[in-house]
Amino acid sequence: QFEQVWLKCDTGMHRLGFIPDEITSARSRLTALSLSDIVMMSHFADAEAPDSALTERQLLRWGQVIDAAPAGSFSNSAATTGQIATTESWVRLGYSMYGGSLVALPGGYSLKPVMQFESRIASVRWIDVGESVGYGGRWVARRRSRIATIPAGYGDGYPRAARDGTPIGTEKGTVLLAGKVSMDMITADITDLPALDVGSPVTLWGDSPYIDEVAGYCDTIGYELCTRITQRTPRLFHRLTGERD
């Protein structure tokens, strides 16, 4: 026997759920099974655009079904942090739990990313003007260049689609991806930061560069990058011990 059942209404996403005209019947069937703790739920298709016609249509349909329900859940991260007013008992946070970029937060607040994808420089070499780096010779040196090899590639979850110029963070500043992403390695132009050397830590995404910035260079979204980290990549978890940690 289930203590609680969540009943999904398809208000416009059209993936799962009962259409509004079917909700009353579905709820009655659950009640007949002595299931009284029923939470109505739905999902926004365009929460990043609170004034869109689709969002307004979904809100209208939601209003038609939620009035008779004791509890409901509609808002995802974007709806929760945006300007969408809903009547509900529960919100469902996903991307915002990672500190991902969302619509503007009230009061000018921002979210702090909780995922840092990091590595260290494993090799450094100089190449002459006209020499290329990586598969296919996509990146070509326009000056004598100092190239760093970083042991992280698409086998670890770094996107193969990343373009030349994708930012990579270091303690001395930002460097740029130079050459195609390999399975186990990427390369970066560190000519302008002579203090960088073998062993220097790098941030592929995290505080800087932000995951959504990297995603923009890969023609994807930060949500996808969060899910791409492979099993072989070591995880290090930090326990928060206070408000300032």
Q: Locations of the language-model features?
A:
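C-terminal accessory subdomain/extension
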Residues: 126-245
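Active-site loop/helix belt of alpha/beta enzymes
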Residues: 1-4, 9-131, 192-194
